[in-house]
Amino acid sequence: MELSRCRVELGTCPQHSKRFLKALTKEKLLEAKHSGPRLCIDLSMTQHMSKKELSRLAGQIRRLYGSNRKASRPFWICLTGFSTASPLYEECLRMNDGFSAYLLDVTEEDCFSVFPLETLVYLTPDSEHPLEDIDQSTVYVIGGLVDESIQKKVTFQKARDYSVKTARLPIQEYMIRRQNEKNYHSEILAINQVFDILSTYFETRNWPEALKKGVSPGKGYILQNSAE
């Protein structure tokens, strides 16, 4: 298949069709599996979630995967702590067309067993360390939680238990709190929002642009140089 040649002249390639674009997307995803970077969604904390929470998480997984497929530089995604007999898996099948054919890894094992601990960086808003860059040899871990089920420092403590490095998105470094009626400010984001930030930064190397992509106005933050 002459995907590489056609990619150079994508606008004029005679194979520029849905079938070709699907094959090109598959090629990019498989390249990411071998060259990185890798993103792990830790789904080992879903056993106490309600049906509503599981549905929200399944929807976030769908949006995350969809964004990754469209990315010019995709990540390779691994869903860990994820049993095919779990209610979340059933919800993913119900809500997400073609879920069983998603190009990603699925394992029941915990992320701390799947990957060498020294390669992991667990992303948690409770970390003291801002994420400065994305390293293609690193596995970035996002806790598979939703807003309604979040308990403070759960993911941070889990990473500490395994002596794994942690980092937080650099919201405090590039954004400021915006006054609002409810005085509400939160750095807790949905997993697809976290991914949108990581993906945008990986493509642009621009944190303000990336944060603007994933931190919605409802979180109570705006970029430092934004007009009030």
Predicted regions: what they are:
Residues I61, L120-V121, D126-L131, V139-Y140, ...:
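Broad hydrophobic/π-residue packing in well-ordered secondary structure
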Residues S137-E228:
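C-terminal folded domains that constitute the principal catalytic or ligand-binding module
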Residues H48-S50, A85-P87, H129-E132, E148-Q151, ...:
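Eukaryotic short linear interaction motifs
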Residues M1-H129, E181:
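RNA substrate-binding interface of SAM-dependent RNA methyltransferases
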Residues E31-H34, R69-A71, S113-P116, E132-D135, ...:
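Intrinsically disordered, low-complexity regulatory regions enriched in Ser/Pro/Gly/Thr
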